[in-house]
From Swiss-Prot:
It is a multi-pass membrane protein. InterPro entries: Cyt_b/b6_C (IPR005798), Cyt_b/b6_C_sf (IPR036150), Cyt_b/b6_N (IPR005797), Cytb/b6-like_sf (IPR027387), Cytochrome_b (IPR030689), Cytochrome_b_C_euk/bac (IPR048260), Cytochrome_b_N_euk/bac (IPR048259), Di-haem_cyt_TM (IPR016174). Binds 2 heme b groups non-covalently. The keyword Heme applies. The lineage of its organism: Eukaryota, Metazoa, Chordata, Craniata, Vertebrata. The chain crosses the membrane at residues 33-53, 77-98, 113-133, 178-198, 226-246, 288-308, 320-340, 347-367. Heme b b566 binds at residues 97, 196. This is Cytochrome b. Heme 1 (or BL or b562) is low-potential and absorbs at about 562 nm, and heme 2 (or BH or b566) is high-potential and absorbs at about 566 nm. It comes from Nectogale elegans. One of its GO terms (cellular component) is respiratory chain complex III. Gene3D superfamilies: Cytochrome Bc1 Complex, Chain C. Its cofactor is heme b.
Amino acid sequence: MINIRKTHPLMKIINNSFIDLPAPSNISSWWNFGSLLGICLVIQILTGLFLAMHYTSDTTTAFSSVTHICRDVNYGWLIRYLHANGASMFFICLFLHVGRGLYYGSYMFLETWNIGVLLLFAVMATAFMGYVLPWGQMSFWGATVITNLLSAIPYIGSDLVQWIWGGFSVDKATLTRFFAFHFILPFIIAALAGVHLLFLHETGSNNPTGISSDADKIPFHPYYTIKDILGALLLILILTTLVLFSPDLLGDPDNYTPANPLNTPPHIKPEWYFLFAYAILRSIPNKLGGVLALVLSILVLAFIPLLHTSKQRSMMFRPISQCLFWILVADLLTLTWIGGQPVEHPFIIIGQLASILYFLLILVLMPITSLLENNLLKW
């Protein structure tokens, strides 16, 4: 009997991607985050779809419609908090996924890595626009502050900002277009994730050692399907715990106050997952410089393959590079903390030092250390 799984045009693609895919025998739990990100995206699209059925993208009714979802719609509160905290889980998985790529040298798959960087930008844009939709105080002022940064672009800046706003301030036109973009972008992200996977399967997965695993492959199913299911269960456990016990833990209380253009909140800050970039933005006194640093804080990931000077791919056998990697992680945590603090002494100087260290580590210290390790190993 002909095996339909291997012959049917559509089933064949699924089979070669998730069932008979040859995978390295030694990939650890750090390789689980790709599938977890896929699950997060599905959760976000489904909950978002149901929220969109009850949401109205009008400045006069947006805040009320979110309240209506939470109070009057059957399990509306659950859908809303799954969506809000699902975004947090999405970013946790994203950061761990990127960190894994940095540590084990997965960035040597250039196409896969660059599409990954593009995906990161797309997810960040989607999350930012989603945060504006409830039309609370932090939604409105966050949108005002961040869109205003584009005015730092020479010559076309102010025109560009008005074009994005659809007027002379963040208003109804802005909210409507942000809702439209927030709805369409996740589907673009899903398509990009498909391309990401396509390029990954051209080369096969990397593994912790960083050396070729062609000599020792195992089928994806059942070994890694069962491993991914375990990861998914843990993800869902953490998400449901967060949603059911402390749904507002990661949110901002200011967003429970309806947007008021006449009253500025004392501390304007984005959601926690943008705080590291926000801290880098604030640490530079010049507006254009700050915007460039903000973009570069993410875009620097695209340059990492060019900065790889080591003879080894992975950091598994490079203790000095490992030290620098964990200093980078600590630095990012410091930046996240600083981003949530008011602009006053000593937070200003800590933020500036942490920002300098961030770029110094990635652009200077890590490549030099890799060269040093090559010499120490007499390579």
